[in-house]
A protein has these predicted regions:
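Alpha-helical support elements that line or immediately flank enzyme active sites
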Residues: 1-6
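C-terminal substrate-binding/catalytic lobe of Rossmann-fold NAD(P)-dependent oxidoreductases
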Residues: 9-10, 15-144
């Protein structure tokens, strides 16, 4: 939706997600010192394949996005904090309107849209692949865009 609306010059995402079953519950030895830390007690920075995966699904974005992940002590639900440099100037109102329209039309049932002050637990059992959070949209100097 963003690429169709304003074009994406480049971008960076931080995926924040629940720890996974292969992480230890207590600090332990591991070749990756981050991965050896207690999953239920720490926010753990790690790598992500999400940026590369987007390039596979949307070839026009291949090589334009990079990112990192942070695993957090929650049982489920993830969030993506995406920042892009838009190819043209925009504002919060335009971004939110496009995302709302997409959630009601071409991405109905796939993309959710909310303006409620929801946190991760509120999305348990939500059937949408992703939910756009209206009050988290920020635009700086017209082209630096941040969405969640």
């Amino acid at each position: 939706v963003l690429n169709d609306l304003v074009g994406i010059e480049t971008g960076f995402m931080t995926t924040i997600h629940a720890y996974t079953g292969d992480q230890p519950t207590l600090d332990t030895m591991h070749k990756d010192l981050y991965r050896g830390r207690a999953a239920a007690m720490s926010m753990i920075p790690t790598s992500t394949g999400a940026a590369k995966a987007i390039g596979l699904v949307l070839p026009e974005l291949k090589g334009k996005l990079d990112g990192v992940a942070i695993r957090v002590p929650t049982p489920n639900v993830s969030v993506v904090d995406l920042k892009i440099i838009a190819k043209r100037a925009t504002d919060v109102k335009e971004i939110n309107a496009a995302m709302k329209r997409a959630s009601e039309q071409q991405l109905k049932g796939i993309l959710g849209y909310t303006n409620a002050p929801n946190v991760s637990i509120d999305f348990n059992h939500d059937s949408h692949s992703s939910t756009f959070h209206e009050d988290q949209t920020k635009v700086q100097n017209g082209t630096l865009v941040r969405v969640m």
